[in-house]
Amino acid sequence: MKQLKKQHEEILKAVVGAYLTQKNEISSALLVKNYGIKFSPAKVRYLMTALEDEGLLVKETKSSGRKPTNKGLEYYAKFLSNAFDLKLINNLEKIFLNRKDNIYNTIEEVTKELASLTGATFVTKFKDPNLILKSINLFEVSESLATIILVVSNGEVLSRKIDIPENKAIKISDLKIAMNIFQDNLIDCKLIDLEKRILLLKDILAEKIIQYEDVIESYVKSILGIGIKSQIYGRENIILSRKIAREDVNEILNILEKNSIWDALEKNSNDFEEIRISINSKGAFFSKRIDENNNLTEISVVAPNESDSNSIKSGIMLLTKIITNNINEKEKDKNERKHS
């Protein structure tokens, strides 16, 4: 997304802030009178017209006012909003930041509160670094479909489908050969290392399977997300929202339950973005990934597209602070025990 000039950013920020408060089209006179804009109304109108030409504002009626488009809301959320809603952060930090409770209980309480305060739906995904694969088997369903059954060290039995696309030259027999190799080499492997370990077996697979790369791709794709503890908070905020189309609700919930918002936003994001953001006709999507000491966590938020991105980003950063503090404390305790 192209960076705007400072003057244009100032006007866009004021328009979005005013619109989120008033939910009406915003005029140049209102910005000058109530929002601290120092330009003349004529200059403001000129800048608003330029923002309209960029697709960031739109005039829907014959009035002189304009409202932000989804593109304008996304630009605001990415570049102009902040993650320092002090009232929200301070109130929750006092309660939760230094709590010695189980981290999952703390995250659950904080996230429930954030979902209630922001009217958004929060999703947390934790990848447990200690889970180990104890058993893995393949069961043929049809010529193009099989099921992988995995047993994990915490007693969970996980099931994953593995499809054979029509454009691939692999067969079920290839998957069975690969499974025999996996059973010999992957048992007692940590789940967080499973994808890496499968890739390391490529030379062995290549000796027995012609299309070994397609086989590896099929298996890796099917086991993505294994060992991740996922929880949705404020589900009702999506279901009951009048600002999200009914036909979009099921699609959004399916994405939240089965996919990574972080990965879904990758195409339109830059590597340097701390929080990935996309705002479109379906809603507003935010995601942050924390990867410290093999503790992979994803925090994602879905809300109506006209939601307050300041509060949402502040909530994400508060959760990040609580999680990283917990990880660092654990590492500190581990190192102290090691040297005691």
Curated annotation (Swiss-Prot):
InterPro entries: HrcA, HrcA_C, WH-like_DNA-bd_sf, WH_DNA-bd_sf
BP terms from Gene Ontology: negative regulation of DNA-templated transcription
Keywords linked to the UniProt accession: Repressor, Stress response, Transcription, Transcription regulation
Domain of life: Bacteria
Pfam annotation, one family: HrcA
Molecular function terms from GO: DNA binding
Record SUPFAM superfamilies: GAF domain-like, Winged helix' DNA-binding domain
Tagged with keyword Transcription regulation: yes
Gene3D superfamilies: Winged helix-like DNA-binding domain superfamily/Winged helix DNA-binding domain
Keyword Acetylation (UniProt): no
Described function: Negative regulator of class I heat shock genes (grpE-dnaK-dnaJ and groELS operons). Prevents heat-shock induction of these operons.
Assigned protein family: Belongs to the HrcA family.
Name of this chain's protein: Heat-inducible transcription repressor HrcA
Organism annotation: Mycoplasmopsis synoviae (strain 53) (Mycoplasma synoviae)
Gene that this polypeptide is encoded by: hrcA
